[in-house]
Amino acid sequence: MSRLFVTCYGCWVRYVVLSCFLMFALGKGVAQQRSMRVMEYNVENMFDTLHTAGLSDIDFTPTGSYQWNSQRYWAKLGRLSRVIAAAGGAQPIDLLALVEIENDSVVNDLIHHTKLWRMGYECVVSHSADVRGINVALVYLPYRFRLLSKDSLRVAPQGKTLRPTRDILHVAGELVTGDTLDVYVCHFPSRRGGKQSQNFRESVAQHLRHYVDSVMCMRSQPNVLIMGDFNGYWPESFLTEGLGVQLAATSEAVQPNELYLLTYALKGGADVRGTYKFQGEWNQLDHFVVNGTMLDDNRKGHPYIKSSSCRLFSPMFLLKKERSGEGVRPYRTFLGNYYQGGYSDHLPILLDLYF
């Protein structure tokens, strides 16, 4: 037997073994991907370092009150990429809603110029009339969520005293099951301002419900996911009346086109009881809301949610001990004007969709 034949035969055997291994690994990977992980994260004033004419963003420049320079900017992007990677674990985050980002360039720097670049993420960003330039974004894996349409939905101020607010981002995409998922990313008006801000949140909630109802009438099998910083918690009236949300855990007869809150009374480790801490009290300001169709766990082959699907993400590296030594709080970037060098004043929330 010639040496050439032996060499070729050995190469052929290695090729067959390698091919079989890759086919097995691919098949196993496909079998394991019968779910997708969704994350929502308010990232606390993720601005670039440049002043944009017409926007009140001068504080977040190198000479502004926060001394927001390139070193701090890139350090924060690196920290955020660590959070996103850790939240995905063995299964990367498929859909990521980012709240409190300034513009497209910030999100593109995050997904293309940090450790996340390997994932191949793409993004859609709102373009709001907010005076500070605050926007929201949806980051997605294009092979898991094929973009169908996108729209930055304007919420017109009601009355002369109300200023423009953040747009609602609506993104429709096709899942690996062939189903269409309509995603709404929102950032409701701040709680500052008392009764006036409450009225504004009511107005945004009513606009959002109108947009969602229109889509649910248009789709034959609607799958709706609303997520973001609502700046409010159950059972405030803008949720129960303006948006018409019910609690998923207490709804005996779930209706396909009604909306259900998944993020009531979430608990994390280290006695964490919400996504935001104010004056020593935890508040659940960040939420996931879905339509009733997605609560049907008999929909094998289509997106559905289990009772354990939704949770806080609160690893210790995202937390900092209170000055009193009792309890913890989110490890934020700034405390007032003091630079702490942390991650965000909010904690992320996670949701697993199953097929």
Which sequence ranges carry the predicted segments?
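Catalytic metal-binding/acid-base residues of hydrolase active sites
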Residues: 44, 102, 189, 230-233
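Structured beta-strand-rich core segments of catalytic domains in phosphoester-bond hydrolases
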Residues: 101-180, 184-189
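Second-shell loop/turn segments in exported
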Residues: 62-71, 92-98, 125-126, 157-158, ...
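Bacterial Sec-dependent N-terminal signal peptides
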Residues: 1-33
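Extracytoplasmic/secreted cell-surface and envelope-processing proteins
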Residues: 105-108, 132-135, 192-196, 233-238, ...
